[in-house]
């Protein structure tokens, strides 16, 4: 029999990272510092790239957009998490929750496409250096960037549309520190099987496509590098590609586990830790990963610092 007089929740309660009061001040300070570093690092990288004409090439245009998306992703998740740790942001309306997830879905998916586009750019630059200016034109670069953001937007629209069919009448407690689709499905009183299928098909397809693009691109890059006889050329290629591969590995690992592994009705703390990794930790690491081993970025930073002194 169907339930009668069901109360549909209009607000959710985010449990946050921890329920232990003694840990909240320390966690707040730690993640506040991480968020500050994320904003400074990524916006600083964007400013550096756009102020240096020598960096106005596709490789750094992709990198500046990656920094923008990392800032977007972190700003979607971290402020709410910080308020939650202060016991001031636990309650969130259904509309706010869906808006946060929509913003989160756009940024996460866009980053997947950007990482794939960056891998193709490195393939073109290293495997076809003489033809690179012809292959990776400014027009193609802008198109790849536009497709990345459009793909992220459309993917978010699909999930948001299927999320709107759900009702929440049993529990309004979300065992997470932000509104993600999986925790929402776990508390839905509507059968979420279709939503899980949509996640598996669309999220899985996007991740498989982008990961395969990265792997195929870097397989060709690796063979090309091994054929090089110049030690300097090998070091430069490995330095550039190594940073990208590290970023890709750190980003895709948690995502694959979160959205492609079989769904479970149980609340898993491991899922929350993995989410923390790619929503908070990766955005602060990317500027470091891409900058410290990049001579052009370091040189540009030195020039900017000299001008400021």
Curated annotation (Swiss-Prot):
Q: Which GO molecular function, any one, fits this protein according to its record?
A: olfactory receptor activity
Gene Ontology CC:
membrane; plasma membrane
Keyword Cell membrane set for record:
yes
**Cystine bridges: which residues?**
97-189
Q: Does the keyword Transmembrane apply?
A: yes
PROSITE patterns per UniProt = G_PROTEIN_RECEP_F1_1 (PS00237), G_PROTEIN_RECEP_F1_2 (PS50262)
The record describes its membrane topology as: Multi-pass membrane protein
- Per the UniProt entry, the signal peptide is none
- Give ranges for the Cytoplasmic compartment: 50-56, 115-144, 220-239, 293-309
Q: What GO biological process terms are annotated to this protein in UniProt?
A: G protein-coupled receptor signaling pathway; sensory perception of smell
- Show which residues sit on the Extracellular side of the membrane: 1-28, 78-93, 166-198, 261-271
Source organism, top-level taxon: Eukaryota
Q: Which UniProt keywords apply?
A: Cell membrane, Disulfide bond, G-protein coupled receptor, Glycoprotein, Membrane, Olfaction, Receptor, Sensory transduction, Transducer, Transmembrane, Transmembrane helix
**Residues carrying a glycan:** 5
> Where mainly found?
membrane
Residues that span the membrane, as ranges: 29-49, 57-77, 94-114, 145-165, 199-219, 240-260, 272-292
Q: Which family does it belong to?
A: Belongs to the G-protein coupled receptor 1 family.
What task does this protein carry out? Potential odorant receptor.
Quote the protein name from its UniProt record: Olfactory receptor 5H17
Q: Which organism is it from?
A: Mus musculus
Chain's gene name: Or5h17
